[in-house]
């Protein structure tokens, strides 16, 4: 314990987590302390690295990279605007031209890049951009991305956590390198620059650096010494490559790509893509083995990521729920047969019939949906179900039996803790099913089978339509499993009819928007809310409380109604 007790969980220390920036600084302070005392705190250091990878992974930065024949800066700027919903505290752009690389960045909003730094006028037909939410170092101009190497000829943007950055930084400082920021990302840029000096190859320098790195990354690298090349790589942080007409766009989210192309490659973990201005590209592992990544097509339309006349994305998505719920049933729900067709599960049909236990793992809102799924599956299929926080699942060495089926639920399909949970389950021999919204996401690729939500892009940070779509899919899954396990056709038909009526009932509620506004106004001065529910409505109470906390920052708690008397 000793002096480490200054980081004890006091009310003052917990209070700082109301501000992400202060929270990150607090975590940095702890990390610095533990590294300085790692000989006596080796266990704490390892635990802290795992904790920060999960906690800080919640704050998603945005990446855009472009190489082609058009002016890069306006394309990158528009891409960053598409990623603003992810949350950030600073932004920046780097372009590559005959004069070298030019970086303009600052703390603040993407709009500030244009209003104060005039980034759209930056020259060059290739470049990278970034929106940052601080993980190492406070939000200020030097800590903003992109970061350059010591020579000023290489630049990168990076999402993720470099867990061993202090070790690498000490070696670089000893070799005479200096740093302008407090970030782990600049350490990686300088490291790549040093390796480029040794190898003369940007690809080789990036690959060698990433082999040495512990942690997670989604990154894009450019160099004025190889101006016709751009390199992207990922491990634990999503990165998508858009393929246009003799042009390429890297992004952390397909929403930044769709305005330019619908053809994309979703990079896998420990995979890199090397793209060239002449329109050619290759993908390979970080270990330099060739890979064959399939070209896929973005399914959603551009207007799906526009506000469509609403003041907020969240409000738009709330009003989309009648349609998104219906889309989750389309082609699946067989009302007269009282059954469901889920083609994505055909490969695991035998495993579902033989299943003796189902484990559902998820985080946040998806965990609340999983609790509803527990009620439904046990009621309709009479199979025992356990619901696990993905963030806790792998750390307790879970017992997985031969006929267990694990279901992973995630809107994005990229939730780091849920990914770690499914990898643990697969390692222990479980059949793993994914229920995700984003086509081509990592969870969709790594599970044995799965079901898409078909909710369309969810831009709002607080989940709405994805939650109801998860309930839609879970209900159909429970019905399918029930019919496999002896549930009668008449019972199935009755449930299917009720499920089919839900979109209309959602619409009826949304039509009462004035009543809802009046209720909100009446209770707007309250400082505490208690959401109560029993049975299947207890998870709904948890979700309701979470929504109020997320959006209003008013304290709210979901609680089992029957427990009030205790």
Tell me the role of every PLM-derived stretch.
Residues 1-57:
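Intrinsic disorder/low-complexity segments
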Residues 31, 55-312, 316, 320-357, ...:
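Conserved short alpha-helical segments that host acidic/polar catalytic motifs at enzyme active sites
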Residues 66-69, 158, 178, 195-199, ...:
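Hydrophobic alpha-helical scaffolding
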Residues 79-83, 235-238, 266, 373-379, ...:
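Short, solvent-exposed amphipathic alpha-helical segments in soluble enzyme
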Residues 151, 261, 355, 403, ...:
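Short, well-ordered alpha-helix to beta-strand connector turns
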Residues 157, 222, 233-234, 242-244, ...:
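Generic beta-strand/beta-sheet core signal
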Residues 321-325, 329-359, 449-566:
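Active-site phosphate/pyrophosphate-binding segments
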Residues 350-487, 493-501:
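Glycine-rich phosphate-binding loops that contact phosphosugars or nucleotide phosphates
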């Amino acid at each position: 314990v000793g002096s480490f007790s200054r980081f004890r969980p006091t009310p003052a220390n917990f209070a700082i987590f109301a501000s992400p920036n202060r929270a990150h600084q607090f975590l940095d302070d702890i990390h610095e302390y533990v590294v300085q005392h790692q000989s006596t705190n080796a266990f704490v250091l390892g635990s802290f690295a795992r904790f920060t990878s999960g906690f800080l992974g919640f704050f998603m930065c945005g990446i855009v990279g472009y190489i082609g024949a058009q002016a890069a800066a306006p394309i990158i700027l528009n891409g960053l605007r598409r990623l603003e919903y992810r949350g950030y505290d600073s932004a920046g752009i780097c372009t590559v031209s005959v004069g070298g690389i030019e970086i303009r960045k600052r703390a603040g909003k993407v709009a500030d890049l244009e209003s104060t730094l005039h980034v759209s006028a930056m020259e060059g037909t290739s470049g990278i951009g970034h929106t940052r939410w601080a993980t190492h170092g406070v939000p200020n101009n030097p800590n903003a991305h992109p970061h350059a190497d010591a020579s000023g000829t290489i630049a990168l943007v990076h999402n993720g956590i470099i867990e061993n950055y202090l070790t690498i930084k000490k070696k670089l400082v000893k070799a005479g390198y200096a740093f302008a920021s407090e970030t782990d990302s600049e350490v990686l840029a300088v490291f790549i620059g040093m390796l480029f000096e040794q190898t003369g190859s940007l690809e080789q320098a990036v690959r060698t650096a990433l082999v040495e790195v512990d942690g997670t990354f989604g990154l894009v690298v450019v160099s004025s010494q190889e101006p016709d090349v751009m390199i992207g790589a990922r491990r634990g942080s999503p990165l998508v490559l858009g393929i246009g007409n003799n042009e390429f766009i890297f992004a952390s989210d397909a929403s930044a790509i769709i305005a330019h192309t619908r053809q994309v490659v979703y990079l896998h973990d420990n995979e890199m893509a090397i793209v060239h201005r002449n329109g050619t590209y290759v993908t390979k592992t970080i270990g330099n083995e060739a890979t064959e990544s399939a070209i896929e097509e973005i399914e959603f339309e551009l207007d799906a990521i526009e506000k469509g006349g609403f003041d907020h994305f969240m409000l738009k998505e709330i009003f989309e729920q009648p349609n998104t719920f219906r889309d989750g049933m389309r082609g699946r729900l067989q009302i007269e047969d009282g059954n469901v067709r889920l083609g994505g599960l055909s490969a695991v049909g035998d495993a579902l019939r033989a299943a003796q236990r189902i484990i559902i793992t998820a985080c946040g809102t998806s965990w609340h949906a999983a609790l509803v799924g527990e009620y439904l599956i046990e009621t309709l299929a009479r199979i025992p179900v356990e619901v696990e926080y993905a963030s806790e699942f792998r750390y307790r060495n879970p017992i997985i039996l031969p006929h267990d089926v694990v279901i992973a639920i995630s809107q994005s399909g990229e939730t780091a803790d849920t990914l770690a949970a499914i990898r643990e389950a697969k390692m222990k021999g479980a059949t793993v099913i994914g229920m995700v919204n984003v086509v081509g996401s990592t969870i969709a690729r790594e599970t044995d089978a799965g079901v898409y939500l078909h909710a369309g892009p969810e831009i709002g940070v607080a989940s709405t339509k994805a939650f109801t779509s998860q309930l839609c899919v879970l209900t159909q899954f429970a019905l399918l499993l029930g019919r496999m396990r002896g549930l009668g056709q008449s019972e199935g038909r009755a449930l299917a009819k009720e499920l089919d009526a839900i979109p209309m009932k959602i619409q009826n509620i949304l039509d009462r928007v004035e009543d809802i506004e009046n209720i909100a106004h009446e209770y707007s001065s309250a400082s505490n809310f208690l959401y109560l529910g029993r049975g299947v409505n207890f998870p709904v109470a948890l979700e309701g409380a979470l929504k109020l906390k997320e959006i209003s920052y008013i304290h709210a708690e979901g609680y089992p109604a029957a427990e009030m008397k205790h």
